[in-house]
Amino acid sequence: MEVIWKFALQITDRQTVTMPVGAEILSVQDQAGGLQLWAIVVPEEERREKRVIEIVGTGNPMADVLAEGLSRFHLATVQARGGALVWHVFELL
């Protein structure tokens, strides 16, 4: 049976989030001042995979992921503090 899990994100350039294999990322939003990622998962799936998440603030430089042999998939743009802070959240593939 599928369920939706929430994963807390750090506000940092790059991080790894461990999820059940096959998790489908739905959304990233600000919740109570912190970034949260929601994904559909199968809790009975014992295998885990590491998903690489990149967060870039508006106006900040972006890493050259092509030079690393990676690509970006946009997950969300999140505004916090009434729009004073804007983060663009990607999964690196």
Describe each region flagged by the PLM.
Residues 51-93:
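Helix-rich interaction surfaces within compact, conserved domain-sized segments
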Residues 1-38, 43, 49-51, 61-71:
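N-terminal domain-onset segments
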